[in-house]
């Protein structure tokens, strides 16, 4: 961000002396946004008091407020914005009783945040980077030419300070707005999944893909221009090494290099974090689908009942006679006495026993990884485990293997965004797609 020439105590004393304060409830903020929108349609960039009252009337109607006291409330709102230095009021003897109003830099900054800065544009970013590249190239050429202190201030320091640094701050602000938009998208996805996740799958996919595409476009644009920008900054830095009186230029170049590194680094980190969130949402949807298989019949039955009068149907059901237990309640029977000894092919193995065996196998694989540094290959583990069970149990066993392995750790290759190779896990065509888990 921009540097501050004042210290913290000086800034605090300055704010206290001038009695700075901002209070913008939703109706006041809406009024300010309405003023900014209407002001943008005017070439002169100024508005009369009557136009402000008309804008306030639109806001009052939207909030369903009474229209009887609209003039008084509009006057109070205008005075409040003037007091908070969001509007400037200009009066003269010629236009007495009909003042002219203009938005202050603070008012423009607030409205820009809510209106214009939220519109991400790759073309806008490309133009900003193109302007920065041109300014840096001219500054680097001027630095290599050399000259007196006035030459360095006018042709090197000034473009870097008042053009390049401000555009870097604008790009940094765009990234921070993108961070906030990601949180809003996450909230939207959470609300969709909580209401009706089946109907929300397509909407979630759209939100995920749009955000991923926007982040990728932003990062690709930064990567394409980042190397050239750093090269020109290095040219300026090399030119200042032989001069002891250019420490102010050297410090500014160092700050710009840090800003550029932070922008590019955070862009890539934001993509990696979003990829992890994308995988988390898809895993949740897959788990919900697996758990909801038994509800398919119930959902179809409800739909059939709702459309009965349009598409009548007949229901056939069987009601068998109840079996009465004629045994003595106090007589305790053993399984061996009732069923006899079961053949080996008919032995029953509980689900919990399978999970315990799986946990033991995964634990053994993990021990090998820790001792010898061998990554955990999910395809190999699943194949070895499925070989111990008949074909009819392969699906359930494979799902348990995957769930347990995912709980152990992650694969660093997942963050690259590249798909893993399909690996066969049995002799009947079943395959698994997963990177090698190498981070626990």
From Swiss-Prot:
Localization annotation: Cytoplasm, Nucleoid
Gene3D superfamilies with a match to the protein in the record: Chromosome partition protein MukF, middle domain (1.20.58.590), MukF, C-terminal domain (1.10.225.40), Winged helix-like DNA-binding domain superfamily/Winged helix DNA-binding domain (1.10.10.10)
GO biological process: cell division; chromosome condensation; chromosome segregation; DNA replication
Residue span of region Leucine-zipper: 208-236
UniProt key word Cell division: yes
Keywords in alphabetical order: Calcium, Cell cycle, Cell division, Chromosome partition, Cytoplasm, DNA condensation
GO molecular function, one term: calcium ion binding
UniProt KW Cell cycle keyword: yes
Entry-linked Pfam families: KicB (PF03882), MukF_C (PF17193), MukF_M (PF17192)
GO cellular component terms, semicolon-separated: cytoplasm; nucleoid
Subunit structure: Interacts, and probably forms a ternary complex, with MukE and MukB via its C-terminal region. The complex formation is stimulated by calcium or magnesium. It is required for an interaction between MukE and MukB.
Protein purpose: Involved in chromosome condensation, segregation and cell cycle progression. May participate in facilitating chromosome segregation by condensation DNA from both sides of a centrally located replisome during cell division. Not required for mini-F plasmid partitioning. Probably acts via its interaction with MukB and MukE. Overexpression results in anucleate cells. It has a calcium binding activity.
Family affiliation: Belongs to the MukF family.
Designated name of the protein: Chromosome partition protein MukF
Native organism: Klebsiella pneumoniae subsp. pneumoniae (strain ATCC 700721 / MGH 78578)
Name of encoding gene: mukF
């Amino acid at each position: 961000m921009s540097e501050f020439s004042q210290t913290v105590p000086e800034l605090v004393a300055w704010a206290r002396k001038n009695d700075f304060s901002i209070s913008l409830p939703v109706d006041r903020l809406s009024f300010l946004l309405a003023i900014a929108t209407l002001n943008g349609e005017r070439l002169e960039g100024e508005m009369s008091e009557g136009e402000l009252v008309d804008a306030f009337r639109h806001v009052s109607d939207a909030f369903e407020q009474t229209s009887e006291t609209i003039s008084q409330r509009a006057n109070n709102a205008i005075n409040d914005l003037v007091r908070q230095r969001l509007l400037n009021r200009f009066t003269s003897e010629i236009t007495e009783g009909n003042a002219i109003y203009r938005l202050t830099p603070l008012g423009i900054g607030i409205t820009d945040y809510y209106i214009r800065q939220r519109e991400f544009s790759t073309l806008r970013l490309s133009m900003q980077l193109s302007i920065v590249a041109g300014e840096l190239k001219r500054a680097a050429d001027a630095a290599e030419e050399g000259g007196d202190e006035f030459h360095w201030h006018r042709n090197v320091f000034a473009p870097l300070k008042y053009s390049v640094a401000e555009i870097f701050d604008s790009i940094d602000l765009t990234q921070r707005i993108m961070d906030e938009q990601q949180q809003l998208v996450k909230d939207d996805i959470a609300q969709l999944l909580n209401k009706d996740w089946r109907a929300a799958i397509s909407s979630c996919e759209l939100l995920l893909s749009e955000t991923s595409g926007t982040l990728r476009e932003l990062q690709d644009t930064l990567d394409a221009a980042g190397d050239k920008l750093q090269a020109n900054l290095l040219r300026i830095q090399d030119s200042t090494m032989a001069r002891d009186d250019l420490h102010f230029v050297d410090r500014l170049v160092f700050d710009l290099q840090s800003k550029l590194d932070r922008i590019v680094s955070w862009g890539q980190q934001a993509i990696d974090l979003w990829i992890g969130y994308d995988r988390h949402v898809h895993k949740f949807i897959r788990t919900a689908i697996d758990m909801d298989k038994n509800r398919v019949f119930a959902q179809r039955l409800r739909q059939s009942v709702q459309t009965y009068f349009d598409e009548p149907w007949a229901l056939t059901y069987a009601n068998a006679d109840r079996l009465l237990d004629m045994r003595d309640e106090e007589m305790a029977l053993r399984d061996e006495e009732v069923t006899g000894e079961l053949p080996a092919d008919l032995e029953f193995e509980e689900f919990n026993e399978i999970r315990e065996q799986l946990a033991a196998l995964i634990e053994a694989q993990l021990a090998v990884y820790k001792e010898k540094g061998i990554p955990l290959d999910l395809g190999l583990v699943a194949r070895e485990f499925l070989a111990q069970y008949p074909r009819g149990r392969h699906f359930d066993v494979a799902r348990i293997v995957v769930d347990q392995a995912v709980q152990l750790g992650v694969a660093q290759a997942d963050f690259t965004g590249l798909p893993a190779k399909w690996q066969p896990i049995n002799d009947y065509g079943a395959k698994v797609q997963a990177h090698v888990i190498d981070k626990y």
